[in-house]
């Protein structure tokens, strides 16, 4: 049984989603958003770090997965997003969690079946697959999709006789 924390990083809104996996079953445990309140980037990064530490304490995940950033609207946005990812990754490593990274295309493909899926399609599939009464908000749905992608990727590698740590995990130590 694994508890996976998925994170969709952002400097203003960071989505998180927690699922429990056993065999082929995925159970929704919780999700939401860390909304930063300060205009100062260092304060926002601390809010992300502190928020994720609290989520880690609450849910006690054994695995951590985060979306890998590959583009942004401009250089300043890319730098801020990278720093938000860094705050999230540090929160995971401080807790001793292995860190796995996935591209947006990998995540969408694992959950929707196509790497070009729209946000609404991701929300719908997350709702259906986790049997939720309503679609989660976009950032939380993306984070749940990250966790689900990690689970599917891990299961596929194990089924093929491989080790889940090969090519899947980015370890930060």
Curated annotation (Swiss-Prot):
**What cofactor requirement does the entry state?**
Mg(2+)
Q: Matching InterPro entries, A to Z?
A: RNaseH-like_sf, RNaseH_sf, X-over_junc_endoDNase_Mg_BS, X-over_junc_endoDNase_RuvC
- Which residues take part in binding Mg(2+) 1? 8, 139
Molecular function (GO) terms for this protein are:
crossover junction DNA endonuclease activity; DNA binding; magnesium ion binding
* Keyword entries, A-Z: Cytoplasm, DNA damage, DNA recombination, DNA repair, DNA-binding, Endonuclease, Hydrolase, Magnesium, Metal-binding, Nuclease
What reaction is this protein's catalytic activity? Endonucleolytic cleavage at a junction such as a reciprocal single-stranded crossover between two homologous DNA duplexes (Holliday junction)
Residue numbers binding Mg(2+) 2: 67
For the biological process aspect of GO, one term held by this record is: DNA recombination
- Coiled-coil intervals: none
The cross-references to PANTHER family, in alphabetical order and at most eight, read:
CROSSOVER JUNCTION ENDODEOXYRIBONUCLEASE RUVC
Task: Kindly state the subunit structure of this protein.
Answer: Homodimer which binds Holliday junction (HJ) DNA. The HJ becomes 2-fold symmetrical on binding to RuvC with unstacked arms; it has a different conformation from HJ DNA in complex with RuvA. In the full resolvosome a probable DNA-RuvA(4)-RuvB(12)-RuvC(2) complex forms which resolves the HJ.
NCBIfam families reported for this sequence: PRK00039.2-1, ruvC
What is the protein named? Crossover junction endodeoxyribonuclease RuvC
